[in-house]
Amino acid sequence: MDVPKIKDASWRDYQAKLQRERRYKDRKKFMRRKVKFVLPVLVVCLAIYGFISGSFGSLFDDGKKAQDPKPGKQQVASKKAAPAVSYDKHEIHHFIDSRHFANLRDNFFEIQSNGRRLRVQTSIDPSLQNYLSQKLDRKNSSHIGIVVMDPDDGRILSLVGFDKANPSNNPCLDSSFPAASIFKIVTAAAALEKGNLRLDSKLRYNGRKYTLYKSQLKEKRNKYTHTISLKDAFAKSVNPVFGKLGTLYLGKTQLESYASAFGFNRQINLEVFLAPSQTVITDEPYQWAEIACGFNRQTTMSPVHGALISATIFNRGKLIEPTIVERISDEKGVNLYQSQPAVVTQAYAPHTSAAMRELMKTTIRSGTVRGTFRKYRR
């Protein structure tokens, strides 16, 4: 399928656009904060913080019953009427599926449901979506899935996929792909919180970085032993180090607990059905090592879930519920669905997020993806 070219499109242009929009949003937020503090008696401000319990009189008078200044006239509420809502995320699955989002070019589409024509407004950024679609290597790939997400609220800005065998399929929503080293994020959070480790904690391993043999899980020191910090082991994706974290520091219980906290083996709500990511942890210590470093094909996940896991770094450990449909309205413009930000779990403690962010930064600066990001450095 040919994708229309974007005139003078470039990654740097798009980044500059995002920065301008971010500065504009920051200015708006600043002005809202000023209004909030200068005019704290406004009903809107009081409603935001939950201080209204019925009337201003109950907050400011001397205990006497508040009097209506103009008896017989209804007071006008300052809060806007809530939009009419008929559907929740699960109900939307009945008339929207992954095919509607197969390389969507616009940020909306229309469908027929129960004799009604519905307009579905998505969170997709068309310019970013089209840019990424142009960059797909369809010739040399069997599957590609690219998900771009706003970590603040879980809005999916781009959902670009390619399946050579089934063009109508969207791999971004397919939960059958091996999680591989993405699971090291889960293991790292568990090690920092339950393994009593720090970023500069020294860890040892023998053999190669990207293998995982049972002999590499033994605690031994000789002239071939390598010493590495937790931070560098993460950045360079050292399998035997993370295998040891699984067997010697965490074990089955902690691995299961943190896997669940990061969204594995649970249903994550999205407006289109998203099968749960899977991991099965047995009683075998070597299997704990395989799970902890992602050296297996049994731990599976979708690209959308991968983006959610990365977003915890920016949300102080919160796993945010994703959303791709902002609203659904009927022919008359009446809202039938409105997305709302929601938290799935607290994957790790807020104070751990700074260390997790440093792990990700080190991976970009000196780790396995250094070459990929080199040309984008300022």
Question: What do the PLM-derived regions correspond to, one by one?
Answer:
Residues D2-G145, N166, S339:
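Extracytoplasmic/periplasmic proteins that interact with beta-lactams or build/remodel peptidoglycan
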Residues S133, A188, E256:
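Short glycine-/small-residue-rich flexible loop motifs, especially phosphate/cofactor-binding loops
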Residues L132, C172-L173:
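Short beta-alpha junctions and helix-cap segments that line functional grooves
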